[in-house]
Amino acid sequence: MAKNTEIERKFLVKSDAFIAQATTSYEIMQGYLCKDPEKTIRVRIRDTRAFLTIKSSLLRDGIAKFEWEKEIDLSDAKELMKICLPGAISKTRYIIKVKGERLKVKGERTKDKGDSLKWEVDVFHGRLEGRVLAEIELSDEDEAFERPDWLGEEVTGQPQYYNANM
């Protein structure tokens, strides 16, 4: 898989049972400098760290997307947030790590038992209060994974669930 390729699947969350499984959580504030349907430029502040991220579906097929991310100075991020498009997002992100099984993925690779997969569950605040989404990042589009009981309907690829469109 190319270094700048991100493969994520996104789901609605039907209960708050994930909170008991979370190993950590942190606050995120993010805004967008560009929200073109095929590419986004995002500024994100996560606690005391900040990142500039470019995502695009132009160079990839399926659910894989190009992603480039660079850590930037917190002061620079705060200045960039001032020029972001309206509709900044505030959310709490919960991290849930789960053990992988011996799952076959495309080609000859396998994910050994003990390898961990990571769920990121976002609980939105402010104008998006009540929205809760979960994402899992995979190494291959065909990689299998166990679905937790708290997971709801899959919404991967549905534009209304892209953070940039909320």
Task: Explain the meaning of each model-derived region.
Residues 1-166:
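Phosphate-end processing signature that detects enzymes handling 5′-triphosphorylated RNA
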